[in-house]
Swiss-Prot record:
Belongs to the class-II aminoacyl-tRNA synthetase family. ProS type 1 subfamily. Homodimer. Keywords: Aminoacyl-tRNA synthetase, ATP-binding, Cytoplasm, Ligase, Nucleotide-binding, Protein biosynthesis. It is an enzyme of class 6 (ligase). HAMAP family: Pro_tRNA_synth_type1 (MF_01569). This is Proline--tRNA ligase.
Length: 576
């Protein structure tokens, strides 16, 4: 490819709305252009990156025995109603009507469609196992699309779905896809971590996320540097306390805490460590229509509530945060001074493990500008109704596998594998005949990769103040040749074209910048775009028999013999 016949349109400034590096740099590099909120056109450079990602994913899916098909973007509401997700999925599911007033959705995922295919296509155990996949456009009506390709409304995903006769076979399919994902992300050239994760709205009994490591990631990844343990913070279990609760040493006392509505303020005012305070979080459920049950969840003041864990407790599925009116009615006080002692109306109390082990703690007195000091379980209030793991783990907690201490880093989710079991086959009655001729439910797994999101995540992990630094495997071009004096020096032109042709003949994805731009402008543009390797061909260097070779990640260029430039470029590429 020659730059003079390619579409390159870089920008000096990023859009004001761009909050993260990938959004800024992809826009400035001319890779994407915004059409509407969360909806982008992939310009030629951006599309090249997407196609390279797709090619790697497709190759590994094929190698793992998955079979490609293509399911529609528009899906009938009946399938979603049959699975129960028409009501469950929420506002992110874009519902539309056709001219006959029939309901459809723009697919955010394809479990319903693939299960419908399976129940019509798979009849016998002899057809199993099977694994279908497709790479298709998705749409999720995000409330606040942001971060460019990181959280768009329209995007491209690879979805795979496995079908097996029993759980053992389904586990083998899951493991095979897990291994394929490991190979995919290794080939993409990204630093990543596979972590155990919650199954969320997809459902199922087991799942792993594949997270690209990046400081801007929205997810917190918990891992043990001394073992293989790794989990999303949503799933990471906090350690059970083995030590016995200390004996009470203080009397219960109501102390004034004017204006101290947060645990940190109370601790500072009373001159106590934050971990001596109690944090009160009020939730509500509706076990019956029109009947509200209020819950008080108690955490240590320095800990944060894990909503995923809370939602899995008996009676708390589908909880919401209580309204201020509900809080005042049950506690006789506005938020900021709430506690478990002397509530106005009965509430169900759930204590985190650490809280159940506390003595002489500080909690709200259910009276504005007052807290209790020296509170103790069993003496000043009943033992908690339920003790559970409610909190997010913190750095330095003992690892659940007992092999060390936990560390935490940020990540961007780009892939997810789920062991579904019979969740969808049961809902949609997808069965096959086993060896005895009896119908049995298909065992399923589903496996997603965010194709377009990978592009954004790769940039979040690989960029500097000058622009993008693409991993070689997904760079729009592997090599750019930058002639200095293209329009003035025939030798420069000839040597540049010679190297260009030689690299193309060896299968290298190379672009020749034949636009005769000034060197500084040319170099800055290609650094912004992020091509991994640049070869500079200039009159002065050729007079000395050399050209310059510089990797995008390196700060200085190396002079290499012009006569062996091809071999040196190929050798350098192998190191990237």
């Amino acid at each position: 490819m020659r730059a003079s016949t390619y579409h390159l349109n870089t920008l000096k400034e990023a859009p004001a709305e761009a909050e993260v590096a990938s959004h800024r740099l992809m826009t400035r590099a001319g890779m994407i252009r915004k059409l509407a909120g969360g909806i982008y056109t992939y310009m030629p450079l951006g599309l090249k990156v997407i196609r390279k990602i797709e090619a790697i994913v497709r190759a590994e899916m094929d190698a793992a025995g998955a079979i490609e098909l293509l399911m529609p973007v528009v899906q009938p509401a009946e399938l979603w109603q049959e699975s129960g997700r028409w009501e469950q999925y929420g506002a992110e599911l874009l519902r539309i009507k056709d001219r006959h007033q029939r309901d459809f959705v723009l697919q955010p995922t394809s479990e319903e469609v693939i299960t419908d295919i399976a129940r019509n296509e798979i009849h016998s155990y002899r057809q199993l196992p099977l694994n279908f996949y497709h790479i298709q456009t998705k749409f999720r009506d995000e409330r606040r699309p942001r971060f460019g390709l990181m959280r768009g409304r329209e995007f491209t995903m690879k979805d795979a779905y496995s079908f097996d006769r029993d759980e053992a076979g389904a586990q083998q399919s899951y493991d095979k896809m897990y291994d394929a994902y490991m190979r995919i992300f290794e080939r993409l050239g990204l630093q990543f971590r596979a972590v155990a994760a919650d199954t969320g709205s997809i459902g199922g009994s087991r799942s792993h996320e594949f997270q690209v490591i990046a400081d801007t990631g929205e997810d917190l990844l918990v891992y043990n540097p001394d073992s293989q343990y790794a989990a999303n913070i949503e799933l990471a279990e906090a350690p059970a306390l083995l030590a016995e609760r200390a004996a009470a040493t203080q009397p219960l006392e109501a102390v004034p805490t004017p204006g101290a509505a947060k645990c940190a303020d109370v601790a500072k005012l009373l001159g106590l460590p934050l971990e001596r305070t109690l944090k009160s979080i009020v939730l509500a459920t509706e076990p019956e229509p029109g009947k509200v049950q209020v819950w008080l969840l108690l955490l240590r003041g320095d800990h944060e509530l894990n909503e995923i864990k809370a939602g899995k407790l008996p009676g708390l599925a589908g909880f919401r945060f209580a309204t201020e009116d509900e809080i005042v009615a049950h506690f006789g006080c506005k938020p900021g001074y709430l506690g478990p002692i002397g509530t106005a109306l009965p509430v169900r109390v759930v204590a985190d493990r650490t809280v159940a082990n506390m003595a002489d703690f500080v909690c709200g007195a259910n009276r504005e500008d007052f807290h209790y000091q020296g509170a103790n379980w069993g003496r000043d209030l009943p033992e908690p109704e339920l003790v559970a793991d409610l909190r997010n783990v913190v750095e330095g907690d003992p690892a659940p596998d007992g092999a060390g201490r936990l560390a935490i880093q940020r990540g961007i989710e780009v892939g997810h594998v789920f062991f579904l079991g019979t969740k969808y086959s049961e809902a949609l009655k997808a069965t096959f005949l086993d060896e005895t001729g009896k119908p049995a439910l298909l065992q399923m797994g589903c496996y997603g990769i965010g194709i377009t999101r990978i592009a954004g995540a790769a940039i979040e992990q690989n960029h500097d103040e000058r622009g993008i630094i693409w991993p070689r495997a997904i760079a729009p071009f592997e090599v750019v040749i930058c002639p200095v004096g293209w329009g003035k020096n025939e030798t420069v032109r000839n040597e540049s074209v010679k190297l260009y042709d030689a690299l193309r003949a060896r299968g290298v994805d190379v672009i020749l910048d034949d636009r005769d731009a000034r060197p500084g402008v040319m170099f800055a543009e290609w650094e912004l775009i992020g091509v991994p390797l640049r070869v500079t061909v200039g009159e002065r260097g050729l007079n000395d028999g050399v050209v310059e070779l510089q990797a995008r990640r390196e700060s200085t260029a190396a002079k290499i013999p012009a006569g062996s430039a091809l071999e040196q470029v190929l050798a350098k590429l192998e190191t990237l």
